[in-house]
Amino acid sequence: MALYEHVFLARQDLSQQQVDALVEQYKGVISANGGSVGRVENWGLKSLTYRVNKNRKAYYTLMDLNCPPAALNEMERQMGLSEDVLRFLTIKVEAHEEGPSAMMQKREERSERGSFGDRDRGDRGPRSFGDRDRGDRGDRPPRSFGDAGGDRGPRRPREGFEGGAE
C-alpha cells in the first residue's frame, strides 16, 4: 500500500462538528477499501487567497493515509461529488512525518509569541508615536515651502506661454 498526505478544504458555513463528520465519512471510505488513516489535523477556519465557489474562508484538514490507489480514487470521487468540499489535494510521500505538521507548528509559535504589542523591538527601543508628524527619520532638516530641494536650483520660466502661475 502507498502512503499519502491528503488536504481538503470544507465550506466556511459548516460547523466544526460537520467538518468532523466529513472526516469520519472519508475515514470510513478508506477503511472499507482496505486502507487506514493515521494522523488527522484540523487546521481550522482560514482565509483563502481568492474566492472559491463564493467562499472567502474554508476549514482546512490534513489526513495521513496508508491505502491502495483504489481506496484513494473512491474517496476523491466522493469528495468531488460533495458540495461541502471545495478543493482537495493528495500527495504521495515516502514516509509520514512524525509530530505536528508545519501548519500546526506555526500556530504553536504564534501562540507562544503573543500579540503584536508584546514583541521584542531589540535595540530600537520602545515604539513612540510622538515623532510621526514629519514622516521622516529625523536626519534631514525640515524643508521650507518654496524650496526646490536637491541640486537643481530654481525653475526657469517657460517660453512662449502667456500667463501662468507667476
UniProtKB/Swiss-Prot annotation:
GO MF annotation terms: small ribosomal subunit rRNA binding; structural constituent of ribosome
GO terms of biological process kind: translation
Region annotation Disordered: where it falls in the sequence: 96-166
UniProt-listed Pfam families: Ribosomal_S6 (PF01250)
Biased composition (Basic and acidic residues): 96-142, 149-166
GO cellular component, one term: cytosolic small ribosomal subunit
Keywords (A to Z) from UniProt: Ribonucleoprotein, Ribosomal protein, RNA-binding, rRNA-binding
Keyword tRNA-binding: no
Entry-linked NCBIfam families: S6
Protein task: Binds together with bS18 to 16S ribosomal RNA.
Family: Belongs to the bacterial ribosomal protein bS6 family.
Name under which the protein is recorded: Small ribosomal subunit protein bS6
Encoding gene, per UniProt annotation: rpsF
